[in-house]
Amino acid sequence: MERNPNPNNLPVELNRTSLYLGLLVVFTTGILFSSYFFN
């Protein structure tokens, strides 16, 4: 079980995490705005 620090692995994971966080924020704001407009 050896961990080889790959410099190309960290930005991909960080970009994927930020992408999922962005999608989650857009999804939650979309639900809030839709509930606000349909209320």
From Swiss-Prot:
Pfam families, A to Z: PsbL
Domain of life (superkingdom): Bacteria
Membrane-related topology note: Single-pass membrane protein
Alphabetized SUPFAM superfamilies for the sequence: Photosystem II reaction center protein L, PsbL
Gene Ontology annotations of biological process type: photosynthesis
Membrane-spanning intervals of the chain: 18-38
Compartments in which it is found: Cellular thylakoid membrane
Gene Ontology cellular component terms for the protein in this record: photosystem II reaction center; plasma membrane-derived thylakoid membrane
S-S pairs: none
Swiss-Prot/TrEMBL keywords: Membrane, Photosynthesis, Photosystem II, Reaction center, Thylakoid, Transmembrane, Transmembrane helix
Main location: membrane
Subunit note: PSII is composed of 1 copy each of membrane proteins PsbA, PsbB, PsbC, PsbD, PsbE, PsbF, PsbH, PsbI, PsbJ, PsbK, PsbL, PsbM, PsbT, PsbX, PsbY, PsbZ, Psb30/Ycf12, peripheral proteins PsbO, CyanoQ (PsbQ), PsbU, PsbV and a large number of cofactors. It forms dimeric complexes.
NCBIfam families: PRK00753.1 (NF001972)
Family under the similarity heading: Belongs to the PsbL family.
Reported function: One of the components of the core complex of photosystem II (PSII). PSII is a light-driven water:plastoquinone oxidoreductase that uses light energy to abstract electrons from H(2)O, generating O(2) and a proton gradient subsequently used for ATP formation. It consists of a core antenna complex that captures photons, and an electron transfer chain that converts photonic excitation into a charge separation. This subunit is found at the monomer-monomer interface and is required for correct PSII assembly and/or dimerization.
Protein name (record): Photosystem II reaction center protein L
Species, as recorded: Synechococcus sp. (strain WH7803)
